Amino acid sequence: MIWKTKRGILDISQQARVMGILNVTPDSFSDGGDHLGTETALVHARRMISEGAGLIDIGGESTRPGSAPVPAEEEISRTAPVIAGLRKEWDGLISIDTSKAAVAAAALEAGADVVNDVSGLQADPEMTGVCARSGCGVVVMHMQGTPRTMQSAPVYADVVREVREFFEERLRTLTAVGIEEQALCFDPGIGFGKNLEHNLALLRALDRISAGARPILLGISRKSFIGKILGTEDLSAREWPTIAITANAREKGVMLHRVHAVRPNVEALRMTEAILGVTG
């Protein structure tokens, strides 16, 4: 399996890759305010790279439940300097986490290779054109509602079928407007417009929800459904369960994992792959 990005082809046919989360926001649910300022953000990016991250996902707007949008200019001012700084010193893949075409365009100009859009390229009508023209990799996430409304009362007749059908529709629509099929990657959007049972149903079905044999990116790091299962609101108590989900997802064929704590998830993936008989 390969994933085509602006920087070239990423081969994920054998070894899964970890995408390190770098939020340059004051209000993200897990690490809001921890990495504000370009140099502080770069220090954390370097740490994640040293721990084995193959991709760094940089976001300037929180998408936690109930969050409000940030103006594009503010999002650009938070993210573009970090992307440009990281690009000067690292040749790995950089992703911009945004639903705004203007932010994506600025990030790609600064050196990003991938656009990670929680709206599935539906929030901004200009986003498909930006992605198609640049030749970047594209992460298409499923979300019911918006970050502000998504957790109010999510309802599905069959969440697995509906998410898969969403990916199938996005594959048809986006390739028809010029985005290459090999540039697409799908994210089921765990915690985005889903309740606990919806999240668990999707995790059980990770090996049968994609479209066009495109890779799945999974983002479950420290999410609230873990705390609900464990009966705790302590974020630190969600780290080991995150690692357990990462290993289980790799068994189901998930090759891209978006996490906060890079090293333990990389080690969980390598151990799982050793058990599966996968060589790098």
Description of each model-found segment:
Residues L22, G52, V115:
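Conserved hydrophobic/aromatic pocket- or pore-lining residues that grip, position, or stack substrates
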Residues V43-G59, K252:
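Catalytic domains of carbohydrate-active enzymes, especially glycoside hydrolases
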Residues M1-Q15:
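SAM-dependent methyltransferases
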Residues D11, A16-E39:
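N-terminal binding-site loop/beta-alpha segment at the start of enzyme catalytic domains
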Residues W3, V18, N23, S28, ...:
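Conserved, well-structured ligand/cofactor-binding cores
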Residues W3-R7, S30-H44, T63-G85, W90-D91, ...:
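Active-site-adjacent loop and "lid" segments of alpha/beta metabolic enzymes
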Residues G92, E180-A183:
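Short acidic capping loops at alpha-helix termini that bridge into adjacent secondary structure
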